[in-house]
Amino acid sequence: MAEMIPAVPVNYEPITVPAGTAVGAAMREHELPNKGPEAVVVVRGADGTLYDLSHTPDTDAEFTPVAACEEDGRAVIRHSCGHVMAQAVQAEFPGTKLGIGPAIENGFYFDFQTAKPFTPEDLKAIEKRMKKIIKGGQRFERHVYASTEEAEAALANEPFKLELVQDKGNVDPDSDEAAEVGAGDLTHYDNVNPRTGEVEWFDLCRGPHVPTTKYIPAFTLTRSSAAYWRGDQTKAGLQRIYGTAFESKEALESYKTMVEEAEKRDHRRLGAELDLFSFPDEIGSGFPVFHPNGATVRMEMEEHSRRRHIADGYSFVSTPHLTKGDLFKKSGHLDFYADGMFPPMQLDGEWDADGYCTKQPQDYYAKPMNCPMHNLIFASRGRSYRELPLRLFEFGTVYRYEKSGVIHGLTRARGFTQDDSHIYCTPEQLEEELTKVLEFIISLLKDYGLDDFYLELSTKDPNKYVGSDEIWERSTAILQSVAEKSGLELVPDPAGAAFYGPKISVQARDAIGRTWQMSTVQLDFNLPERFELEYTASDGSKQRPIMIHRALFGSIERFFGVLLEHYAGAFPAWLAPHQVVGIPVADTFAPHLEKVCAELRSRGLRADVDTSDDRMQKKIRNHTTGKVPFMLLAGERDVEADAVSFRFLDGTQVNGVPVEAAVNVIEAWVRERNNEQPTKDSIAERV
């Protein structure tokens, strides 16, 4: 299986750097590597800020070395490689204007204003020039502009950079533009020729960067596309080049192999090949339609989840797709999330014969989230502490207006169904309930064949939160304790929480090592206040419940896409749309297989006989391509012995199995929800 070499924490010990000493010099004194995957490329300060190796502290300070093979190390290498690419582009295509160029997950991009789109031949020429720049060992040198005026003068020929300089202080710290300009000094990085000391190229940038271009040992440019300045379709059109870089050629090659495998597993491609779903233009972008094969898989996914939820004490509810706008005003969605909602429909207005409005219409919205309606269910009558925890669950379809450029098959759609739960509990119940929720999530995800997880803890953004510091600290400590007790790796996400509460995200790695965010467990201090939710405590007082948002799959559609890629289309037998197909050696043996399939259907299995005009070998190829886990063959000997022969997706067979034994084996395999594909060895030992 093709897996990318993951980022590996080296866990260097912090080093005290004396005032006035460059941190790079301190690293050399400690004889830390400057070559290879464990080479130190930047350092991390006590507050988490990354610094160049040229950074010189004003006072004695501790810094932790960051290796090239670590997540942050890779990001810095990619950011620096983006600068090299931009330098190469402007050298190859004089007059090109610079947009922004941040590191992103698994790579980087840079935007350019050019006379014409980039071609594949252009990318090859850019790569060739980049290799020359990297071989030259140019230094990355950080400089601070003395004033805004100095920056504007230096960037007079770069209109997009000038706009960023003029917007300084108004740039979203979470945006890609923040890599170029944000809080603090206005800085630029010069690419300096090590032999002559001349500045070969420079760019407005906050950094940090690797010391020299020789710290970029392996890179590739992957594609180009159209883009808009600052992602706004009303602004200038740009050309974007994507690339990636790694700490070693081996890591880059493993990434390329993974990408090739991922392309084969692309759920959009498999969805069409296996007749699972489609996206008709007549319906609109981002709205999938499930065909019989896909709907069967989806039904099995939902049914198993439904049974598990009932067994775990969840109460099923159902809410409408549309609601008055007042509800989302009350919940705060219209204040904080309006851009992600579809425009309102104005309904219930009345007009007289002359066209005068006698009753103002009301705004109705397609719901983007289920939580406000679940709160109305909680508030529909008085609640006692004896009813808590109350676990409401719904397969609730929601609608979110995603820009067309970010829609991606089933994994980023505009209409999708969440397996959405909202849990209301007392403060005393919170830790136990969170523990149960996390255990339930991991257990259920394992049922579907995912088994490699880690957790991410998103904590308070000090500039954007509701609720007291005390409740944030307590709830964050509880979440952290629950996460640590799970035994799973816990990765911090400082200041990554939504304004209304801390969150645990369950991240899952698939068969080729990619990470997918699966489930979220989100505490909410905001909505119980907005909806004035109350329960009667044991002493008769009215108290606010604590609310937990929990989406296990994220959405049915997205989880479907993840599983489809994880299994490369070969769903386990319990999920497969066609579990068994009978293939007669000749038409005369079809009635024998019809009886076998009828018995399987009577036991609740999906089984049919292929009676098409194709020859047997063609039928086997068709159903192997169609990923049918059990193919049953029958010829003269099988009929005489009241037997069948098994054929599996790997091409192996088990011949002459008595019908009763074959039916029992298949039924048991499916009932067990075995996530492995059946093979000669695994079935032979059962018959």
UniProtKB/Swiss-Prot annotation:
Keyword Aminoacyl-tRNA synthetase attached: yes
Coiled-coil regions, chain positions: none
Reaction it catalyzes: tRNA(Thr) + L-threonine + ATP = L-threonyl-tRNA(Thr) + AMP + diphosphate + H(+)
Top-rank lineage group of the source organism: Bacteria
Keywords: Aminoacyl-tRNA synthetase, ATP-binding, Cytoplasm, Ligase, Metal-binding, Nucleotide-binding, Protein biosynthesis, RNA-binding, tRNA-binding, Zinc
Key word Cell inner membrane present: no
Gene Ontology MF term list: ATP binding; metal ion binding; threonine-tRNA ligase activity; tRNA binding
Localization (cell): Cytoplasm
SMART domains (alphabetical): tRNA_SAD
GO cellular component terms, semicolon-separated: cytoplasm
CDD domains cross-referenced by the UniProt entry: ThrRS_anticodon (cd00860), ThrRS_core (cd00771)
Entry's EC annotation: 6.1.1.3
Region of interest (Catalytic), ranges: 266-572
Positions contributing to Zn(2+) binding: 371, 422, 549
Similarity comment text for this entry: Belongs to the class-II aminoacyl-tRNA synthetase family.
PANTHER family: THREONINE--TRNA LIGASE, CHLOROPLASTIC_MITOCHONDRIAL 2, THREONINE-TRNA LIGASE
Subunit note: Homodimer.
Task of the protein: Catalyzes the attachment of threonine to tRNA(Thr) in a two-step reaction: L-threonine is first activated by ATP to form Thr-AMP and then transferred to the acceptor end of tRNA(Thr). Also edits incorrectly charged L-seryl-tRNA(Thr).
Identification of the protein by name: Threonine--tRNA ligase
Higher taxonomy: Bacteria, Bacillati, Actinomycetota, Actinomycetes, Mycobacteriales
Gene from which the chain derives: thrS
